[in-house]
């Protein structure tokens, strides 16, 4: 599944992106971010991160540097660990 998603991203970068121009407000671009997220986190979580990123890329966003979080910084896992530590 990861291979298919990455192939679709490559197609987008080669065929579609040049027609739209450079509109991304972030570094790396949203398509590069999506590719990295899928490679580091797998198809499901990587797609989720990519969709969140694309939703943040709009004219009212300040943009800037927004790197893919490392695989071991899963906020859900941290939240679940905190919840377990507070159980009686």
Swiss-Prot record:
Disulfide bonds: none annotated. It is a peripheral membrane protein. Residues 68-88 are annotated as: Disordered. Keywords: Cell inner membrane, Cell membrane, Membrane. The keyword Chaperone does not apply. InterPro entries: Membr_insert_effic_factor_YidD. Residues 75-88 have a biased composition (Basic and acidic residues). It holds the Pfam family YidD. It comes from the Bacteria. SMART domains: Haemolytic. The keyword Cell membrane applies. It is found in: Cell inner membrane. GO terms for cellular component: plasma membrane. HAMAP family: UPF0161_YidD. PANTHER family: MEMBRANE PROTEIN INSERTION EFFICIENCY FACTOR-RELATED. Belongs to the UPF0161 family. Could be involved in insertion of integral membrane proteins into the membrane. This is Putative membrane protein insertion efficiency factor. It comes from Burkholderia ambifaria (strain MC40-6). The lineage of its organism: Bacteria, Pseudomonadati, Pseudomonadota, Betaproteobacteria, Burkholderiales.
């Amino acid at each position: 599944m990861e291979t298919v998603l990455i192939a679709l991203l490559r197609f987008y970068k080669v065929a579609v992106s040049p027609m739209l121009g450079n509109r991304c407000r972030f570094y790396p671009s949203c398509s590069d971010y999506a590719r990295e997220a899928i490679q580091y986190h797998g198809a499901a979580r990587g797609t989720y991160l990519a969709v969140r990123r694309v939703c943040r890329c709009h004219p009212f966003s300040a943009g800037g540097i927004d790197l893919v979080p490392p695989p071991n910084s899963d906020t859900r896992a941290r939240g679940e660990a905190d919840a377990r530590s507070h159980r009686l």
